[in-house]
Amino acid sequence: MSSLYFAILCLFMIFLVPLHEFGNAQGSEAELQLDPSMCLRVECAKHRNQKWCFCCAGLPRTCFLDKRGCTSVCKRESPSMA
C-alpha cells in the first residue's frame, strides 16, 4: 500500500510543475506588455525596410524598431518627469 501512496505523490508533484511554470509565464509576459501611455506604434519613416516603429509618447523623435527598446528608454525618460 505504501508504494501506491508514493506513486500518487509522484503524480501529484509532476502535475504541479506545469502549474508553477504557467504562473511564472504570466508574470514575465506582464513585463513585456506595451504601456499605451508610454510607447506608440507608428509607421516608420526612417526605416524603409520595416513598416512599424515604436515611439515614446512624449518624445516623438525617439523611435525604436522593437517594443522592448522603446519601453526601456521611455521608462527612463518619461515626459511627465521632464
Curated annotation (Swiss-Prot):
Expressed in stems, leaves and flowers. GO terms for biological process: pollen-stigma interaction. The keyword Nucleotide-binding does not apply. Residues 1-22 form the signal peptide. Disulfide bonds join C39-C55, C44-C74, C53-C70, C56-C63. The keyword Disulfide bond applies. It comes from the Eukaryota. Keywords: Disulfide bond, Signal. Belongs to the MEG family. This is EMBRYO SURROUNDING FACTOR 1-like protein 10. The gene is ESFL10.
